[in-house]
Structure formats: C-alpha cells, structure tokens
C-alpha cells in the first residue's frame, strides 16, 4: 500500500478494511470498518480531512480531496463508482455515486440517493433523501424507489464481500502465457444484475 504521513498526520485504516496496493492515502485520511478502496484510488488528505465510513467502497481510479477545514465524507455504506471525483463534499448514508461523476465543494448528497454516471453536481448543492440526480449540472429527476435501493444495496454488498475476498485471496503473481484448460470463471456473491437486465 502507498500510505504516507504528511506533516506528521498519518492515515488511519481499520484492520478490516481492504486497500489495494496501487491506491494512495496521504495525510488526514480515516478509513472505517469493512471499507473497500480499489486500484489507483487517490485519497489526498493534505488540506481537508477525508473520511470513508464503515461498509463504504471507493472503486478504481476514484479521487477524494478537499479544502482546508472542509471534510470530504462518504457515509456508511456509500458506493462510489469507478473514476468518480469527490471534492469537499458529503455523500449521504447508503447513497451511490455513479461512474465518472464529479461532486463539488460543499455539495451534500442526501441519504439513499443515486447520482447517475457522468453527472456533475455543482458546488453548494443541497440534496434531500432518496433523490435520483442526473446530468450536468445534476438535477433531481425522480425519487428513488424501494426497488432502486434493493439494487443499490446488492451492489454495495458485492463490494463488502469483495473486501473480505481480497483480504483472503488477492495475490500478486506473474501471468500465464496461455489460458489453462477448463479455466475457472470468477463470480460475485449475490445475484445482482446490470440495470436494464
């Protein structure tokens, strides 16, 4: 893991969290229980504090950063998709931020909300619970249904299970030169399907 103290402030990582070795944690970063931090994620706590609460995940290539005296927080069971950028914002409990979305300074995403992939949430946005936010700039397009939340929670459960699986079974290796006969397929632990299927 690439974990760095900055001016004497050392990142805090709960022993049940999983941090991919290519992720970078700098300075004032606090990682909670059962958190998954994916490959190439960058959590740069050199100005503001970065907090990822229990059961949340920050997937491949995500960036967290913030201004001085402004915390950037992913609350419990938050789900942050590949390539998202979080800057001095708060992601509410059990919410999902879609792939390559950007959440700007002072924005608050309400609990149990979903930010659609590729959305841009403006600075100072004040969201409410159970909103579907979409677009650039992101707008409330509809309310979140119980079915939406079931799908979101299954996806988050996959990452919570992946945290344990990676801690137990992710091993650096050298590649094979050809696929072996009867090559096994890796699978998730739930029956979650992509939207639309």
UniProtKB/Swiss-Prot annotation:
Instruction: Spell out the coiled coil positions from the record.
Output: none
Residue ranges for the region (Disordered) are 177-197
Pathway the protein takes part in = Amine and polyamine metabolism; carnitine metabolism
List compositional bias (Basic and acidic residues) regions by residue number.
188-197
Alphabetized UniProt keyword annotations: Repeat, Transferase
What does the entry give for GO biological process?
A: carnitine metabolic process
Per its UniProt record, what InterPro entries does this chain match? CaiE (IPR023446), Hexapep (IPR001451), Transf_Hexapept/Carb_Anhydrase (IPR050484), Trimer_LpxA-like_sf (IPR011004)
**Cross-referenced SUPFAM superfamilies:** Trimeric LpxA-like enzymes
Q: What is the similarity comment for this entry?
A: Belongs to the transferase hexapeptide repeat family.
Return the PANTHER family for the record. Answer: DYNACTIN SUBUNIT P25, GAMMA CARBONIC ANHYDRASE-LIKE 1, MITOCHONDRIAL-RELATED
* Cited HAMAP family: CaiE
Q: By its UniProt entry, which NCBIfam families does this protein fall under?
A: PRK13627.1
- Report the protein's function: Overproduction of CaiE stimulates the activity of CaiB and CaiD.
Record's protein name: Carnitine operon protein CaiE
């Amino acid at each position: 893991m690439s974990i760095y103290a900055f001016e004497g402030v050392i990142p805090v990582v709960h022993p049940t969290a999983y941090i991919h070795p290519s992720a970078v944690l700098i300075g004032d970063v606090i990682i909670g229980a059962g958190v998954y931090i994916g490959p190439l994620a960058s959590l740069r706590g050199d100005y503001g504090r970065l907090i990822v609460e229990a059961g949340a995940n920050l997937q491949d290539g995500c960036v967290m950063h913030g201004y001085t005296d402004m915390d950037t927080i992913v609350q419990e069971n938050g789900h942050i998709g590949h390539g998202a950028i979080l800057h001095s914002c708060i992601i509410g409990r059990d919410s999902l931020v879609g792939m390559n979305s950007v959440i700007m300074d002072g924005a608050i995403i309400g609990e149990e909300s979903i930010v659609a992939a590729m959305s841009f949430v403006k600075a100072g946005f004040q969201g409410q619970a159970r909103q579907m936010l979409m677009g650039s700039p992101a707008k409330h397009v509809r309310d979140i249904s119980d079915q939406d939340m079931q799908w979101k929670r299954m996806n988050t459960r996959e990452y919570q299970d992946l945290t344990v699986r990676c801690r137990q079974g992710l091993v650096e290796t050298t590649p094979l030169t050809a696929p072996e006969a009867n090559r096994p397929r890796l699978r998730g632990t739930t029956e979650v399907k992509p939207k639309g299927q």
